[in-house]
Amino acid sequence: MAGRSGDSDEDLLRTVRLIKVLYQSNPPPSSEGTRQARRNRRRRWRERQRQIRSISGWLLSNYLGRPTEPVPFQLPPLERLTLDCNEDCGTSGTQGVGSPQILVESPPVLDSGTKE
């Protein structure tokens, strides 16, 4: 699973369950009452969410020895990335489905500001 050397999967699962209980103990505020009452409930809810987020980070870093932020993701070289949308772009969920298209010649992204 996602454990490092020395960490057991049970410790990770127990910590994740605890964090899940913390988030479930703070449901979103109701939309009833006056505008001021709704605003106060949202403000208090956001503050509790911030506290839960910091407690979760503390649990992950101190109890399991993991950073709260994910490990940096290695991106492909810039030459392979394009903004070409000549064909049907579709929705973001369908983009990239099918045969991959890699441009041989990359278009200039930043020009000097003059049009040709």
Curated annotation (Swiss-Prot):
Single GO MF annotation: DNA-binding transcription factor activity
Location of the region described as Homomultimerization in the Swiss-Prot/TrEMBL record: 18-26
Membrane spanning stretches: none
Motif Nuclear export signal and binding to XPO1, residue range(s) on this chain: 73-84
GO annotation terms (biological process): mRNA transport; viral process
Pfam family, one: REV
Localisation per UniProt entry: Host nucleus, Host nucleolus; Host cytoplasm
Gene Ontology CC: host cell cytoplasm; host cell nucleolus
Modified residues (Phosphoserine): 5, 8, 92, 99
Region described as Disordered: spans on this chain: 23-48, 90-116
Assigned keywords, A-Z: AIDS, Host cytoplasm, Host nucleus, Host-virus interaction, Methylation, mRNA transport, Phosphoprotein, RNA-binding, Transport
Motif extent (Nuclear localization signal and RNA-binding (RRE)): 34-50
Biased composition (Basic residues): 36-47
Free-text description of this protein's post-translational modifications in UniProt: Asymmetrically arginine dimethylated at one site by host PRMT6. Methylation impairs the RNA-binding activity and export of viral RNA from the nucleus to the cytoplasm.
Major subcellular location class: host cell
Subunit relationships: Homomultimer; when bound to the RRE. Multimeric assembly is essential for activity and may involve XPO1. Binds to human KPNB1, XPO1, TNPO1, RANBP5 and IPO7. Interacts with the viral Integrase. Interacts with human KHDRBS1. Interacts with human NAP1; this interaction decreases Rev multimerization and stimulates its activity. Interacts with human DEAD-box helicases DDX3 and DDX24; these interactions may serve for viral RNA export to the cytoplasm and packaging, respectively.
Domain notes: The RNA-binding motif binds to the RRE, a 240 bp stem-and-loop structure present in incompletely spliced viral pre-mRNAs. This region also contains the NLS which mediates nuclear localization via KPNB1 binding and, when the N-terminal sequence is present, nucleolar targeting. These overlapping functions prevent Rev bound to RRE from undesirable return to the nucleus. When Rev binds the RRE, the NLS becomes masked while the NES remains accessible. The leucine-rich NES mediates binding to human XPO1.
Further details from the record: HIV-1 lineages are divided in three main groups, M (for Major), O (for Outlier), and N (for New, or Non-M, Non-O). The vast majority of strains found worldwide belong to the group M. Group O seems to be endemic to and largely confined to Cameroon and neighboring countries in West Central Africa, where these viruses represent a small minority of HIV-1 strains. The group N is represented by a limited number of isolates from Cameroonian persons. The group M is further subdivided in 9 clades or subtypes (A to D, F to H, J and K).
HAMAP family documented for this protein: REV_HIV1 (MF_04077)
Protein name as annotated: Protein Rev
Organism annotation: Human immunodeficiency virus type 1 group M subtype B (isolate YU-2) (HIV-1)
